[in-house]
Amino acid sequence: MDIRTAVRVGVMVIAGTVSGAQQAAAMQPAGSATAPDTPGTGPYPAMKEEIPALARNVVYRPANVAAMGARKLGVVAWGNGGCSNDAASTRFHLLELASHGYLVIASGRILSGPGAPPASGERLPFPQTVPGDLIAAIDWALAENTRQGSPYFGRIDPKQVAVAGFSCGGLQAALVAGDPRIATVIMQNTGTYEGERSTMPGLKVPKSTLKKFHTPVLYIIGGPTDVAYTNAMEDFALIDHVPVAMANLPVGHGGTYHEPNGGAAAQVAVDWLNWQLRGDAQGRARFIGANCGLCTDPKWTLEKKNFPAP
């Protein structure tokens, strides 16, 4: 079963019929929705917050930005599973990224976990978020970098911008990947498809979307039982113009988002961001070389192409 048929029973179909808070509860394992936030394992313990000036997004950041000293923040714009408006639905994963010195901006509001309001039960149409929310996140972050009085004034590196997302949110990331400010893309548990799905009315993400990629791309997929597996592997085969890596961990479509600190997939995402945005040698070593970290880890299957020879 690939994502084109599985969306009827997967998280994407939920987005068109229930509230963001109800969808978040459906997507998260029992107990996960009520678990406390985790600060991440990076050097900068992280937090999440809603900012009035950013009405359609939630910010994940180091709790003490000043502790970074002269080091600059990178920016990651994030699309949620189901294109939902619950920006806390993958909070452990996003807090982990933020703890490594990234300003992660997720579409939506806090609708699950700590800080969430009671579920309203309101039925919202699909999609609850749009690709433009990712662009708005990048716009806001880069504007804050130059705004006198902003807590982020001069603290963001505008060359360190990534876009990423889970499932339907990954499709949103693909749709905006042509933005020249974006330096890398992470596609998680997702892949493009031809046509239009009744469960995702109006969302068209054909294979031609892959031509928008102008930077290195990482796919993190849940193995053959992931409903996005077939579409993602088709994408990997078709991408011939930019470096692309395909990292498969056999955990299914739900990934490791709800494991402590986002689990194994979050660590791979951090290593990729550190390599692609900061030139980090340790991050590079997870992907490149005959004895690369993912190459020798029996839990992962790594494929890659179009990279310069090591």
Where on the chain are the PLM-derived regions?
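Gly/Ala-rich beta-loop-alpha elbow adjacent to hydrolase catalytic centers
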Residues: G165-G169, A173
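Alpha/beta-hydrolase active-site loop
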Residues: R123-P158
